[in-house]
Amino acid sequence: MRSLIIVLLFPSIIYSMSIRRCEKTEEETWGLKIGLCIIAKDFYPERTDCSVHRPTASGGLITEGNGFRVVIYDQCTEPHDFIITDTQQTRLGSSHTYIKFSNMNTGVPSSIPKCSRTLCISVYCDQEAGDIKFEEYTQESSDISIRVKYDSSCIDYLGINQSFMNECIRRITTWDRESCVRIDTQTINKYLKSCTNTKFDRNVYKRYILKSKALHAKTEL
C-alpha cells in the first residue's frame, strides 16, 4: 500500500514543479489577436508590401497588400482609440494570404466599451475586380464580437483565428495558435511583416469605410 501511495503522489509532485505561477503583470496584461487566413480563387495574389490607412482618432482602418483590401471598424460613434494597434501581412505559397490584426496591451475587456469590442470586417480582392458576391462569417464571445463579409467570387476560403486573453492564459493554453489551412504558426510568424502607415487621406478613408458600412447594413447578401 505504501508503494502505491508513492506512485500516486509522484505525478502530482512533478506537475506542481513544472507549472509556474502566473505573475500579477501577466494576469493584468490582456491582448487581442485576429488572424485572417485567405485563399484566393482563380487567381494568384501578387506578393507585395502592405500598407495601413487610418485616422489618428477613429475606430477603423484599411489595409492593402498581397492581393486584398481589408476594411475593419468598430461600432463607436465618438472619437476614441481604435482597439487594433498593429497590422501584419504575408503571402504564403501561391494562393494563401495571412493578415494579422493585434493589440497586445488592450486592458481588461470589461474596461473597454462594448462598441470598441464589436468589429465589422470587409474583405475585397484588390488585384481582381470580382463579381462582388459576398458571404458572411461571425464569431462572438462575451469579450468580443467579429462579423466578416468577404467577396466569395474571388476568395475560395476565409478562416479566422481570434484570441482575447491575458498573458497568463496565453502562456499556458494550447489552443492559442495561428494557422492557415495546413500552414502552421511557426511558418506564419516567420514571414509576417508589419504594414506601413500611409499618409492619411480622409476622402479615401471615408469612401471605403462608408462602402463597408453599407455592405454590413444589408440583411441579405
From Swiss-Prot:
Q: What induces the gene encoding this protein? A: Expressed in the intermediate phase of the viral replicative cycle.
| Biological classification of the source | Viruses, Varidnaviria, Bamfordvirae, Nucleocytoviricota, Pokkesviricetes
- Please, which domain of life does this record's source organism belong to? Viruses
Name assigned to this protein = Protein OPG195
Q: Gene that codes for this?
A: OPG195
Q: Name one Pfam family in it.
A: Pox_T4_C
Q: Which family does it belong to?
A: Belongs to the orthopoxvirus OPG195 protein family.
